[in-house]
């Protein structure tokens, strides 16, 4: 309910901003309405399609195999652990998958809390103790229980819409001035070449700025998932798991998957563009109890 309220309030704020832009620039509302519809369709369409296909795409990207029937003691333990933690978190048991990778990693995805997927790497199963692995699984279960995948989709849809809409509004203004076309009868976009070039550049720039917002939220939700894991299995187990990650291989999963994994890539120009907070910050947050309620 809180996610939907946040979504509606955000979009109300977006509409207020759009109204101010129209009032200040005097752009014809008819063209803006069409542009807004297009921005909403493209902005949210791509995000929701990705969400609906997330389980399939995730499994394909890592070559994961869903466990239909446990074949050995490790798979039995994994299924039992996920089932137990799901009951504790109050969600339906997700599908469980294993994928072959040397790095210690796991991820959760899915369009709904009760139709989700948890996948773990063979590197995690081979290199972590049972206590550490339990903590990682609890971290992913917490992502599902918190509804992080849906919330990320809503946020991504809003920022996508902003990027598309604002970049084209500004491109329309720039094309009108730079093209010297002030005659409304010749079209609202001015010189089409200038309009296209400016729109592409602005989309690139605004897209980079928008990624800072989505990455901030991604880092923020990692702290809460760590706290959720601590509540499910104990703080010390989660701290031990994060300390183990500090000695693991650099993750090999595709960049598009990093926001869903417990272990993000550490090589980044700035923490602002990282999907995960530095491991030391996550450990310190657990020790201080900052996100544990």
Curated annotation (Swiss-Prot):
EC number: 3.4.24.-
CDD domains: M48B_HtpX_like (cd07335)
Cofactor: Zn(2+)
Topology versus the membrane: Multi-pass membrane protein
Protein location: Cell inner membrane
Membrane-crossing residue ranges in chain numbering: 4-24, 34-54, 158-178, 193-213
NCBIfam families: PRK05457.1 (NF003965)
Protein's recorded name: Protease HtpX
Gene from which this protein is expressed: htpX
